[in-house]
Swiss-Prot record:
Chain's role: Condenses 4-methyl-5-(beta-hydroxyethyl)thiazole monophosphate (THZ-P) and 2-methyl-4-amino-5-hydroxymethyl pyrimidine pyrophosphate (HMP-PP) to form thiamine monophosphate (TMP).
Enzyme Commission number(s) from the entry: 2.5.1.3
Cofactor binding description: Binds 1 Mg(2+) ion per subunit.
Residues engaged in binding 4-amino-2-methyl-5-(diphosphooxymethyl)pyrimidine: Q37, L38, R39, I40, K41, N69, S108, K137
Metabolic or biological pathway: Cofactor biosynthesis; thiamine diphosphate biosynthesis; thiamine phosphate from 4-amino-2-methyl-5-diphosphomethylpyrimidine and 4-methyl-5-(2-phosphoethyl)-thiazole: step 1/1
Family to which the UniProt record says this protein belongs: Belongs to the thiamine-phosphate synthase family.
Pfam families for this protein: TMP-TENI
Catalytic activity as recorded in UniProt: 2-[(2R,5Z)-2-carboxy-4-methylthiazol-5(2H)-ylidene]ethyl phosphate + 4-amino-2-methyl-5-(diphosphooxymethyl)pyrimidine + 2 H(+) = thiamine phosphate + CO2 + diphosphate; 2-(2-carboxy-4-methylthiazol-5-yl)ethyl phosphate + 4-amino-2-methyl-5-(diphosphooxymethyl)pyrimidine + 2 H(+) = thiamine phosphate + CO2 + diphosphate; 4-methyl-5-(2-phosphooxyethyl)-thiazole + 4-amino-2-methyl-5-(diphosphooxymethyl)pyrimidine + H(+) = thiamine phosphate + diphosphate
Gene3D superfamilies associated with the record: Aldolase class I
Lineage per the UniProt record: Bacteria, Pseudomonadati, Pseudomonadota, Gammaproteobacteria, Enterobacterales
This protein's UniProt keywords: Magnesium, Metal-binding, Thiamine biosynthesis, Transferase
Protein name, UniProt field: Thiamine-phosphate synthase
Keyword DNA repair annotated: no
One BP term from GO: thiamine diphosphate biosynthetic process
Length: 211
């Protein structure tokens, strides 16, 4: 039963790009994306605060679901739509502060044990990955593949889910066929020969999400 301790999100968040700059946030929101994440790694809060402020402002302008990866204090301070955390961040994050601020929470998982940990936090959505091999970040776990993803989806039933990891334009339809609510993409857009065309095609497949 989907009863999170955080504000709910639609079961289908649609196409969900994960990008590392405000420039990408702006161009993708202009292109019609309505769920997006700013993921900047390994910088101090003061180094990324201006980018977080700018990203959140863009999210409001386009009435989009703008998630901030990791920098939960800044997300609370500047009232982002939501925060996304990795498993390693859950123990060091004040989840009650995020909850009290009314922000949505997404949590990454890589196996059944991590899904248990995520469910205990009762987040707004659960990310499942990595589905395929990915060059975007070093991953200690093995790719899950479509069969394992489908198994996780069956277990999570009505919980909003996001598949991530190595999802290309060519693989997007097969990933969504598992029943997952949304697909997160990185290089499928940012490294595409024509990012506008790739975004438009992915939006055709995954949509912009439910209201």
């Amino acid at each position: 039963m989907y009863q999170p301790d955080f504000p709910t999100v639609p079961f289908r968040l649609g196409l969900y790009p994960v990008v590392d700059s405000v420039a990408w946030i702006e161009r993708l929101l202009e292109a019609g994306v309505r769920t997006i994440q700013l993921r900047i790694k390994d910088k101090r809060d003061e180094e990324v605060e201006a980018d977080v402020i700018a990203a959140i402002a863009l999210g409001r302008r386009y009435n989009a679901r703008l998630f901030i990866n990791d920098y939960w204090r800044l997300a609370i301070k500047h009232r982002a739509y939501g925060v996304h955390l990795g498993q390693e961040d859950l123990e060091t994050t004040d989840l009650k502060a995020i909850q009290a601020a009314g922000l949505r929470l997404g949590v990454s998982t890589h196996d059944d044990m991590e899904i248990d940990v995520a469910l205990a936090a009762k987040p707004s959505y659960i990310a499942l990955g990595h589905v395929f091999p990915t060059q975007t970040k070093q991953m200690p776990s093995a790719p899950q593949g479509l069969a394992q993803l489908a198994s996780h989806i069956e277990r999570l039933a009505d919980y909003p889910t996001v598949a991530i990891g190595g999802i290309s334009l060519e693989r997007a339809t097969a990933v969504l066929a598992t029943g997952v609510g949304s697909i997160a993409v990185v290089s499928a857009i940012t490294q595409a020969a024509d990012w506008r065309a790739a975004t438009a095609q992915l939006l055709d497949i995954a949509g912009v999400g439910d209201e």
